[in-house]
């Protein structure tokens, strides 16, 4: 819920349109065990004050009549629904954060690989990059799936993060 509220105000906070569009999230379930998992997630969301719904097959047919219910490869039993959920344009979001960081004095170097991290006593002293060395007093890692690699490079041990492939189907209007 907290995350969703942050997204709802992010364009205003960054003074940059991140193109956040709340169109709901409907997660179909195709087996009794998937239904149980959806019910578990639904209950967790409700306990945290997030509006969520569990739809049985009749609710689903009433709300989304155009799905292929009869000839679907996997039987559709129902869905977990979060009506306020949505998505944002990833590139707009990145540029909004980059512009905000720049206005706070952050230097952003694109296409620049970190090759090493120099520590003195218990502090990071410099970052070695494919473009040379950068002396610094503060470091922030914002590199998505590569964060754990840099964390180890800095000698900070293992982060409990696993990277997983994510596929998205993105469409844009052709003009």
Mark where each language-model region is.
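Dinucleotide-binding Rossmann-like beta1-alpha1 core, especially the glycine-rich loop
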Residues: 1-66
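Internal, well-ordered alpha-helical segments in soluble enzyme and binding-protein domains
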Residues: 3, 37, 41, 56-59, ...
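Generic secondary-structure signature for well-ordered alpha-helical cores
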Residues: 5, 9-12, 47-50, 65, ...
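Alpha-helical scaffold segments in soluble metabolic enzymes
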Residues: 6-9, 40, 96, 100-103, ...
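Short aromatic/hydrophobic contact patches that present stacked aromatics
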Residues: 25-27, 79-82, 168
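Residues that scaffold the ATP/ADP-binding catalytic core of kinase and kinase-like folds
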Residues: 63, 117, 150-153
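Helical element adjacent to the flavin cofactor pocket in flavoenzyme catalytic cores
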Residues: 75, 79-138
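Central helical "cap/lid" subdomain
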Residues: 129, 133-175
């Amino acid at each position: 819920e907290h995350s969703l509220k942050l997204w709802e105000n992010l364009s205003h906070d960054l003074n940059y349109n991140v193109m956040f569009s709340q169109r709901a999230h409907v997660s179909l379930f195709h087996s009794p065990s998937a239904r149980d998992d959806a019910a578990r997630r639904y209950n967790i969301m409700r306990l945290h004050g997030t509006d969520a719904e569990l739809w049985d097959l009749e609710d689903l047919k009433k709300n989304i009549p155009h799905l292929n219910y009869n000839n679907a490869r996997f039987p559709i039993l129902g869905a977990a629904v979060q009506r306020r959920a949505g998505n944002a344009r990833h590139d707009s979001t990145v540029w909004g954060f980059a512009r905000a960081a720049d206005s706070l004095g952050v230097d952003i170097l694109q296409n620049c690989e970190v090759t090493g991290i120099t520590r003195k006593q218990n502090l990071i002293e410099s970052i070695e990059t494919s473009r040379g060395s950068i002396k610094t007093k503060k470091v922030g890692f914002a590199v998505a799936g590569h964060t754990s690699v840099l964390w180890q490079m800095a000698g900070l041990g293992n982060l409990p993060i696993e990277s997983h492939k994510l596929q998205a189907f993105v469409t844009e209007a052709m003009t």
